[in-house]
């Protein structure tokens, strides 16, 4: 593909130095450059891609896209490559990857789901609804991508994949005849333009609560990042006969902020107020949820293995997307009922024990509050003793939103009977200091160390302690890691799986893959 043709996709080009050339592929890592490649020099938080232009050209790059003016780049072999200057290299990378694959999202109806909590579950529900409708559907979540019969793991930690992966997944979907796709869109993915060049037709939000102020700086900046998905509806590529629809949560503060963004149609869902999509007669049990789903086209009884009020809200969001796609109520209800569970989301681990053992991804204050409230409901059901307790294991990540540590410690202190604070990706921060911040907040809520509050640095030992403390009817819940397959200490990712750790703990053993383990 010619460079001129590729760069026609860019929102803006500030200057062009050199001639038109044939491009082999688009890369943003100088170590991956092959002869004939276009190298995108992206300024990062700690490393500036402009520093590697010379290396990229030496490896054979014939063109470079960057932000800095040529005169600031110093001595380079200018006659041997073309330099295209843009206002935002990261955004350009997204558009270039989309153009390289001939804008695959324009060949299907694309749904984007964003929000603080519940995105992955909602995406799985939407995908199931599409399948129930007999659509040739695809999905990209922070857990996996599903393309035809193929399922691809999308990474160690949960965020929207980088532009080359996003566009490759969509291109593979287009090649296999996918007509409808749903994508989980994180705030990082939006702020870093990972979905630039993705033309969404439906934008849906679960909720926008406290999260990621370490990255975005302020709650307002975080909210603005989420809003980009809705802001882009009006300017995105129009597909024949496919309307642009915004799906909004009237129960969430984001409703007031997102509802003014223009769309062909706004579909509103709510657990408690007037809306297009609602639920009534909600019955929560420890192993399933029943409710009547009220849609513009009628009412349907829904029964799902997903538990908790928050999952009813996720189901309503997915149902509203189904309405946006013009699907029948019975099809929507069938899809909701088909999802048996989502990896690492209120996932039960069974080994014949007389208490419930659960793994959940809850890693934000709101999510922790919701899962602990649900765990309390579960502990009080099914003939359990009135004294059945909730035992929580959780931690807070290093180099991330510090305010969450006290907030989550306070919530755990209020809502759990026994609190065990442990590691969750401490990175280069002191694990002891992270745990101390959460422990202080739990103590302020009346918890006493050594009585109903413990700090256990090794996560495997923490989960084992929780299981050893459990009595018949109790609920043990390990929060924060969910389906993730690694934990970061320093700058190293160590193999880790909360579900395997829980299975071992139920056998009286520990998963000892972390540097905190006692060997």
Give short role names for the model-derived ranges:
Residues 23, 36, 61, 80, ...:
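Short, well-ordered alpha-helix to beta-strand connector turns
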Residues 91-248, 256-262, 316, 510-514:
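Phosphate-binding loop of NTP-binding sites
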Residues 1-14, 32-38, 44, 48, ...:
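ATP-dependent carboxylate-amine ligase
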Residues 72-79, 176, 199-357, 441-442, ...:
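Acidic, Mg2+-coordinating active-site environments of NTP-dependent enzymes
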Residues 66-69, 185, 207, 250, ...:
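Short secondary-structure boundary segments
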Residues 62-68, 245-250, 393-394, 417-425:
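Short internal beta-strands
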Residues 49-61, 83-88, 92, 201-206, ...:
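A short, gly/pro- and small-residue-rich
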Residues 1-95, 99, 275-278, 301, ...:
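N-terminal leader/targeting and accessory segments in enzymes
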């Amino acid at each position: 593909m010619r460079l001129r043709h590729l760069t026609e996709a860019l929102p803006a080009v500030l200057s062009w130095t050199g001639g038109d050339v044939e491009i082999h592929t688009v890369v943003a890592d100088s170590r991956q450059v092959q002869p004939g490649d276009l190298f995108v020099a992206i300024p990062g938080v700690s490393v500036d891609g402009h520093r590697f232009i010379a290396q990229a050209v030496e490896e054979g790059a014939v063109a470079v896209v960057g932000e800095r003016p040529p005169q600031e780049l110093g001595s380079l072999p200018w006659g041997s490559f073309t330099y295209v200057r843009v206002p935002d290299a990261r955004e350009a990378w997204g558009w270039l990857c989309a153009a390289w694959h001939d804008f695959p999202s324009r060949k299907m109806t694309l749904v984007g789901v964003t929000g603080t909590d519940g995105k992955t579950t909602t995406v799985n529900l939407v995908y199931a609804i599409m399948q129930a409708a007999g659509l040739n559907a695809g999905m990209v979540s922070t857990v996996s991508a599903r393309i035809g019969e193929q399922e691809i793991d999308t990474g160690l930690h949960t965020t929207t994949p980088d532009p080359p992966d996003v566009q490759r997944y969509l291109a593979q979907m287009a090649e296999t005849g996918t007509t409808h796709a749903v994508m989980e869109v994180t705030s990082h993915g939006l702020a870093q333009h990972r979905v630039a060049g993705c033309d969404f037709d439906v934008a849906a939000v679960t909720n926008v609560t406290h999260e990621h102020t370490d990255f975005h700086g302020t709650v307002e900046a975080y909210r603005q990042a989420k809003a980009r998905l809705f802001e882009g509806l009006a300017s995105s590529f129009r597909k024949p006969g496919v309307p642009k629809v915004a799906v909004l949560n009237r129960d969430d503060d984001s409703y007031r902020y997102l509802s003014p963004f223009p769309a062909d149609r706004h579909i509103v869902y709510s657990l408690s107020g007037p809306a297009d999509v609602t639920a009534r007669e909600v019955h929560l049990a420890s192993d399933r949820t029943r409710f009547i789903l009220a849609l513009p086209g009628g009412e349907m009884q829904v029964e799902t293995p997903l538990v908790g009020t928050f999952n009813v809200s996720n189901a309503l969001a997915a149902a509203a997307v189904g309405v946006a796609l013009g699907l029948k109520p019975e099809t929507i209800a069938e899809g909701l009922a088909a999802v048996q569970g989502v990896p690492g989301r209120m996932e039960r681990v069974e080994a014949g024990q007389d208490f419930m053992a659960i793994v959940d991804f809850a890693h934000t204050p709101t999510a922790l509050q919701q899962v602990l409230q649900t765990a309390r409901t579960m502990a009080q059901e099914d003939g359990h003793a009135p004294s059945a307790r909730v035992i929580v294991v959780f931690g807070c990540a290093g180099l991330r939103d510090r305010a969450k540590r006290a907030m989550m410690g306070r919530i755990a202190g209020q809502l759990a009977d026994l609190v065990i604070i442990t590691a969750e990706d401490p990175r280069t921060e002191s694990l002891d200091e992270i745990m101390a911040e959460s422990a202080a907040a739990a103590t302020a809520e009346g918890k006493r160390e050594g009585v109903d509050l413990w700090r256990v640095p090794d996560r495997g030992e923490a989960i084992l302690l929780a299981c050893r403390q459990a009595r018949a009817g109790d609920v043990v819940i390990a929060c924060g890691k969910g389906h993730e397959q690694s934990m970061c200490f320093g700058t190293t990712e160590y193999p880790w799986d909360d579900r395997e750790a829980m299975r071992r703990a139920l056998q009286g053993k520990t998963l000892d893959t972390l540097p905190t383990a006692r060997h």
